[in-house]
């Protein structure tokens, strides 16, 4: 799949190794105009160009860079934003209509007409990048909500920014809402079991820092994999967590009694598999790394 109008981008000062894997997995499935990793770490890789940035000491720093700094580094018509927990999974799901819009991301749960969408795996036009830079927003975090909800009416009226309709966004990516069909990409560590298998999953887990590995999203990944009929993947995740993270009570308890619902699970939204029961969906996963 040739996407010669799109630059593949990740910005990560915490998990650059995992972000590089997201770039690698995406490049295995599509040819991009360019691939760039923005980080403060000394990274040597042939997977992407590495551009040094000041360290992101908070999520707000990341958001400000995405809103104000990214435009200066992009020469293509579009950028595809990936993160350590979101990347391309099915190039055959690409739809040229995605590029009819300035922003495409997985739909959120909101029912007010402003539910597109998640920024962790998102397609953005160069026009949008210039608009977010020039707007000089005083509130920047989280950047996807600032673009797609808080300031969406302003971006539409002042800059003519076009957001993809929900039906098309569902074909592009998913996060908390399963589409029931293959999508171009996904976001969310809890969904990684749908995208990776075997050595690729092991490489991804190894690339995570201990603090991220022991966090709620990775534990929810194990829970959802178990509920989705892949206890082997759940056990792979949990064993990695227990081997590296001290006093991770949630992982230890789930290893002992995996069929129980535990208090460590995220309370923000229902898990994908819990929401849809047995109607879970999984594309052909990546099972190896180059």
Where are the predicted features?
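N-terminal anchoring/stem segment of glycosyltransferases
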Residues: 1-63, 69-74, 230, 234, ...
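Non-catalytic N-terminal targeting/anchoring module and adjacent flexible stem/linker
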Residues: 1-6, 183, 188-290
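Short glycine-/acidic-enriched loop or helix-start segments at secondary-structure transitions
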Residues: 20, 47-48, 89-93, 133
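Short, conserved loop/helix-junction motifs that constitute active-site signature segments
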Residues: 29-30, 73-74, 95-99, 124
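Short aromatic/hydrophobic "clamp" motif used to bind/position activated sugar donors
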Residues: 79
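Active-site acidic Asp-centered loop
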Residues: 82-83
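Conserved donor-nucleotide/metal-binding helix-loop-beta segment in metal-dependent transferases, i.e.
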Residues: 87-116
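Catalytic core and acceptor-binding pocket of nucleotide-sugar-dependent glycosyltransferases
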Residues: 116-233
């Amino acid at each position: 799949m040739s996407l010669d109008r799109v630059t593949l981008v990740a910005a990560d000062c915490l998990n650059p190794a995992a972000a590089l894997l997201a770039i690698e997995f995406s490049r295995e499935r599509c040819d991009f105009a360019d691939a760039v990793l923005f980080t403060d770490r000394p990274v040597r890789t042939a997977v992407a160009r590495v551009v040094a940035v000041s360290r992101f000491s908070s999520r707000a720093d990341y958001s400000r860079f995405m809103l104000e700094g990214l435009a200066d580094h992009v020469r293509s018509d579009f950028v595809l934003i990936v993160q350590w927990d979101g990347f391309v999974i099915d190039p055959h799901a690409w739809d040229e209509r995605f590029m009819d819009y300035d922003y495409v991301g997985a739909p959120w749960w909101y029912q007010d007409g402003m539910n597109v969408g998640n920024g962790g795996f998102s397609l953005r036009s160069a026009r949008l990048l210039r608009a977010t830079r020039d707007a000089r927003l005083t509130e920047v975090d989280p950047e996807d909500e600032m673009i797609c909800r808080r300031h969406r009416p302003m971006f539409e009226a002042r800059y003519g920014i076009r957001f993809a309709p929900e039906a098309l966004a569902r074909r592009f990516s998913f996060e908390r809402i399963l589409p029931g069909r293959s999508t171009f990409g996904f976001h969310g560590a809890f969904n990684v079991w749908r995208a990776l298998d075997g050595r690729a999953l092991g490489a991804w887990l190894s690339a995570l820092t201990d603090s991220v590995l022991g966090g709620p999203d990775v534990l929810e990944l194990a829970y959802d994999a178990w509920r989705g009929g892949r206890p082997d993947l759940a056990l792979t995740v949990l064993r990695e967590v227990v081997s590296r993270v001290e006093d991770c009570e949630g992982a230890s308890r789930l290893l002992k009694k995996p069929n129980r619902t535990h208090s460590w699970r995220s309370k923000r939204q229902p898990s994908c598999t819990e929401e849809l029961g047995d109607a879970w969906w999984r594309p052909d996963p990546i099972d190896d790394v180059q």
